[in-house]
Amino acid sequence: MKILVVGGGGREHAIIKKLKENQSVETVYALPGNGGMAEDAVCVPIGATDIGKIVDFAVENQIDYAVVAPDDPLVLGAVDALNGKGIPCFGPRANAAIIEGSKVFSKNLMKKYGIPTAEYEVFNDMDSALRYLETAPIPTVIKADGLALGKGVIIAQTRQEAQEAVKSMMADKVFGKSGEHIVIEEFLTGPEVSVLSFTDGKTVKPMISSMDHKRAGDNDTGLNTGGMGTVAPNPYYTPEIARECMEKIFLPTIQAMNAEGRTFTGCLYFGLMLTPKGPKVIEYNCRFGDPETQVVLPLLESDLLTVMQATTNGTLAETEVRFSDKNACCVILASKGYPVSYKKGYPITMTQEAKAHTYVAGAKLDETGKLVTSGGRVTGTTAIADTLEEAIREAYRLCDGVTFENAYRRSDIGQRALRALK
């Protein structure tokens, strides 16, 4: 089989490595991929949002199955376009990807169908948003409606911070069109849990839970990032909570999308907060999370391609989705200065042992064929072990085998989860 994977980050590298465990997969093409995954896939310099070229490539190369991993091409209709040429795909069509593409849509969906989430108001003009903030409870959460590279959510601790966030989105247009509408919602407290799930639009099969580490600095300080590391499973996510989420959140979401004529297939990511009043949805993503994928997929014991095809064929109910009962930890190595500004082009070296456990994100091959840094988050190194403590220790040991100038990592990935276990 010839498989096409759209995207070029660590998440895509993890998906590709897992797909290649299936003996029937002969070639995986990554569009655009990156220099660090060139040994695992044929990287083709076509951008992830260049849908016309992606479709042309898929047709010319007689692709048997496509996986569209990032949010942008999904929201832009990459699956619709590939399906239109008879190519089966993993991922939702554009009318379902809106569940991530528009925060206003997803909040209104939850309200309409009684899915637990934070109280909220939607604003289309800055003046009414600022007026509302004069009396709104603080802290509060300001969200840009559209996609904003994971940076479109501001937790404002003061009224002034909230007002500045609204102005930057609606007047300064820091997120462009994505900030034309905004959501202002109540600040929830409690442990956060990421649950990715496979769905064919009828059945939901959750993957193992995980815990992300969003802030750039140790002890959850500094700016929000795309994620500096993850552990799985998440110790806060008990079997009782899992049952409650399936009954009150996971299935109702899929049923709500069906009722709206927006059947969702692929990977639906539930960002949850376990509040004193029960689990609530903070966000939906219409795709695998990054770096959650780098701990979740290594623990998947079932064949990934088989499960993906079941979401496409509507046969997920009778397809086994089994996970290991071990623990995983992924440590991200980033460029110093991320997520603001950082230098690129530093050579990356990896020991053979580290390389086998590392997913490459922000890297490319230079003119001489040497792997150099090209982004904020450069690599993610994952270890699996019987206990969480061992997985964390091993992930850091393996991560020591990845080096480049001005590399930065958090030193406390998984420590919050360890405290929860004690």
Residue ranges and their predicted role:
Residues F90-K151:
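A conserved helix-loop-beta module that forms one wall/lid of the active-site cleft
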Residues L365-T368, V372-K422:
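Generic C-terminus detector
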Residues G152, A156-T293:
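Internal nucleotide-binding/catalytic subdomain
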Residues M246-L268, N285-E353, D366:
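Active-site "cap" helix and flanking loop/linker of ATP-utilizing ligase/carboxylase catalytic domains
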Residues M1-A94:
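ATP-binding N-terminal substructure of ATP-dependent carboxylate-amine bond-forming enzymes
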